[in-house]
Regions:
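Alpha-helical transmembrane segments and their immediate juxtamembrane cytosolic regions
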Residues: 1-226
Length: 226
């Protein structure tokens, strides 16, 4: 519970902080090649093990059983899905986020007006449960996870624009407050997880807890480095 508060948001914040625009084709190839290669290797391994144990491999509705864990959607409890790459949603969503913040030039305005886009996406996520069913087909699609992930990435981009020394100074001063907020949110807001759209009482509280926990983590990393 305490780990899930910040572990994936911290990755998106770091990714946003380190972001540099690249050609969109390069982004897709670099992000998806490890996923595809490992998935194919895992599939071949599973087929081999199945043949060695049972002399056959159940290929019924194979494409659907393989693709649903990647693209998401409302799962059918009667279907035996094949998970070839645990955590594949992260590189997929990170790739989509990178594409829309600047790697695709048509969306470069997202990176230029990151503060405004940040506020719009935050408002969208905070109010989403008020007018939409979080368990519908669209929300359960993996690409939809780009929306709860994007604010953290944009926050990382905004932090990159701040003077590094000033950032470290304020982080050092505020780390006790961040730690208290992190502990409170971890206990009060319950278990949270971007993958399953579990944000506790509200996305805003999840965001505050995640940023606070990430700030403590970053301070610890810089402290041990020093």
């Amino acid at each position: 519970q305490f780990f899930y508060v910040f572990h994936m948001p911290a990755f998106f914040i770091i990714s946003g902080y380190l972001y540099r625009p690249h050609d969109w084709k390069r982004t897709i190839v670099s992000m998806m090649t490890p996923v595809v290669v490992f998935s194919l290797f895992n599939l071949c391994f599973q087929i081999l093990i199945s043949f060695l144990k049972e002399g056959c491999y159940d290929s019924t509705d194979l494409f659907r059983r393989i693709m649903v864990p990647y693209i998401g959607g409302v799962a059918d409890p009667n279907v035996d899905y094949i998970v070839l790459f645990m955590g594949a949603w992260f590189p997929i969503v990170l790739m989509l986020v990178r594409l829309v913040v600047g790697d695709i030039k048509a969306f470069s305005f997202v990176g230029r007006y990151k503060v405004a886009v940040f506020l719009v996406v935050m408002a969208f996520m905070v109010t989403l449960p008020l007018w939409a069913d979080m368990n519908n087909d669209i929300c359960q699609m993996k690409p939809f996870l780009m929306f709860p992930s994007l604010p953290f990435f944009l926050l990382g981009m905004m932090l990159h624009d701040v003077d590094t020394q000033m950032l470290h100074k304020w982080l050092k001063r505020l780390v006790p407050l961040f730690f208290i907020v992190y502990l409170f949110m971890a206990i009060w807001n319950g278990r949270v997880e971007i993958l399953n759209l579990h944000f506790g009482h509200n996305y805003l509280f999840f965001f505050i807890g995640a940023v606070s926990g990430s700030a403590v983590l970053f301070w610890l990393c810089s402290h041990f480095k020093d």
